Amino acid sequence: MKRPDYRTLQALDAVIRERGFERAAQKLCITQSAVSQRIKQLENMFGQPLLVRTVPPRPTEQGQKLLALLHQVELLEEEWLGDDNSGTTPLLLSLAVNADSLATWLLPALKTVLTDSPVRLNIQVEDETRTQERLRRGEVVGAVSIQPQPLPSCLVDRLGALDYLFVGSKEFAARYFPNGVTRSALLKAPAVAFDHLDDMHQAFLQQNFDLSPGSVPCHIVNSSEAFVQLARQGTTCCMIPHLQIERELAEGELIDLTPGLLQRRMLYWHRFSPESRLMRKVTDALLAHGHRVLRQDTA
């Protein structure tokens, strides 16, 4: 069995984090040539490239797996160090999270962890249908996903559901839906999606109004918070988590355009096994807060 030297793995990790060999060498306090030699040593050990030498460099699939191993080991070392680690370099905590969770419940859930533990948080925003792939590739150590089944050597727990409402402003409703939300009216009503793979709005319209994909005009905006702003200013209708717009609904800035109809996304917390002390803190925090603010009754 090939057992990599973790010093050489740290060189690979530094090149990725620092986006180049020169800055990686400065970070590790060694020469650029030494960084190259350590990575070449790793590549010779595994008989394949571990780094795509682009600008910035990026890891190959095997490189991703090795980096995932390194990040797991770094977290597990915290078990042995205990709590007496003040003054040490904060541990990197890379998580893959959907934008709507980040905009609503996730950061409050992590408040205690970020306050009490020496960590550097690295949030990678991805659609909830694809976050698990980042965990599979070793880019992160934990992921919020809609997938209920764990990956090999991983753990999973249910967090709860986000309920999405089809909303818009009163002015938008008066302009585009004077006779109610109908199939023909929806064909002219501007919508918004997070990216070209975000199909929530389209799935809602297809399920409830038999509208085929691509049949409605749709903006692309990579911001959950911008969805709220666009809806409030009367320029789009869109699917937004109820949790995110409770105030706007209560004050009448936004209205539920299709009362009784919603999209529900059950969320699950995935992470590598075994868990370090830090990851158990993260798990406990996410589950406790998720069970408080996310919908648990899925009937």
Swiss-Prot record:
A single GO molecular function term of this UniProt record: DNA-binding transcription factor activity
Gene3D superfamilies reported in the protein's UniProt record: 3.40.190.290, Winged helix-like DNA-binding domain superfamily/Winged helix DNA-binding domain
Keyword tags: DNA-binding, Transcription, Transcription regulation
Subunit structure: Homodimer.
DNA-binding region location: 21-40
Entry annotated with the keyword Cell membrane: no
Role: Controls the transcription of genes involved in arginine and lysine metabolism.
Record has Calcium as a keyword: no
Superkingdom in the source lineage: Bacteria
Family annotation (InterPro entries): ArgP, ArgP_gammaproteobact, LTTR, LysR_subst-bd, Tscrpt_reg_HTH_LysR, WH-like_DNA-bd_sf, WH_DNA-bd_sf
Residue ranges constituting the HTH lysR-type domain according to the UniProt record: 4-60
Family from the record: Belongs to the LysR transcriptional regulatory family.
Cross-referenced Pfam families: HTH_1, LysR_substrate
Annotated protein name in UniProt: HTH-type transcriptional regulator ArgP
